A protein has these predicted regions:
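Helix-biased detector of long, well-ordered alpha-helical tracts
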Residues: 2-261
Length: 261
């Protein structure tokens, strides 16, 4: 396949993926007298410009009802965040949409994050919703260049949830917090009617200290930067899917939930 063929295929694919409604139709044409051999280069440039205009376009949520896709972390989630939450709450700390917000208290630089955990099953090989809730929030702080210090936790429990299961979850949270060097300093508990929840949901928020001039985040990534991976990719997700019976295979995997710092 020639370079020209590859360029043509890429242009065709992107034109199909980016709706024309995101473009200014008056500048979407080709030069009337393009030099021989430059037609595809010109077309690719126009497609790239169309992509950039689409990125700058005001995000929209086309669905009338919330779907599971809106919580799956993909394109639907991003559209929901930008079109609903960011549009309403917009401020300089929120706009970067990083794992943690960069804020200050006097001369102290802080990272602040929150996350909610609705994993099912609650207990899985290698951990449970409790240590996952601690490690997930601690890691959002760590990858933002902060030293995690304090966490809050909120529980939404379903009527009829076994107290012994709650004790196991809380004990695992305490152990994970100790291992990560953080303190759980405040919390909240609510109980919903039987059938109105899935046993136990947990929210954790965390605060960490950022020292020096360190400034980590997606916005600072540049070509050539190293990507550091703390272990095998996907162990936790596949472990959960196996426990749910969603994969037609057998494997002895355990979740790798752990603090990365």
């Amino acid at each position: 396949m020639t370079h020209q063929d590859t360029t043509q295929q890429r242009a065709d694919w992107v034109e199909a993926a980016v709706p024309a409604e995101h473009t200014d139709e008056h500048d979407a044409g080709y030069p009337a007298h393009a030099a021989p051999g430059t037609e595809h280069t010109g077309r690719e440039q126009l497609v790239l410009e169309r992509i950039e205009r689409a990125r700058r376009a005001r995000p929209r949520v086309r669905e009338k009802l919330i779907t599971l896709a809106h919580g799956a972390g993909g394109k639907a989630t991003q559209s929901l965040i930008e079109a609903v939450f960011l549009d309403a709450f917009r401020n300089p700390a929120l706009e970067p949409l990083e794992d943690a917000a960069a804020v200050t208290a006097g001369d102290t630089r802080l990272a602040f994050t929150t996350d909610s955990y609705v994993v099912s099953p609650l207990f899985f090989p290698g951990g449970n919703i409790g240590d996952l809730a601690v490690n997930g929030t601690v890691n959002d702080l760590a990858v933002s260049g902060a030293r995690p210090v304090h966490l809050s936790t909120g529980f939404i429990l379903e009527e009829g949830f076994p107290v012994e299961d709650l004790r196991r979850i809380v004990a695992s949270m305490a152990a994970a917090a100790k291992a990560a060097g953080v303190s759980i300093v405040t919390g909240d508990t609510k109980v919903v009617q039987r059938g109105k929840g899935d046993g136990c949901y947990i929210n954790t928020a965390g605060v960490g200290l950022v020292t020096g001039e360190l400034n980590l985040g997606v916005a600072t990534a540049r070509p050539g930067d190293a990507v550091i991976v703390s272990g095998p990719v996907g162990d936790h997700g596949i472990t959960i899917m196996l426990e749910r019976g969603e994969l037609d295979l057998e494997a002895e995997l355990v979740s790798d939930t752990a603090p990365v710092h």
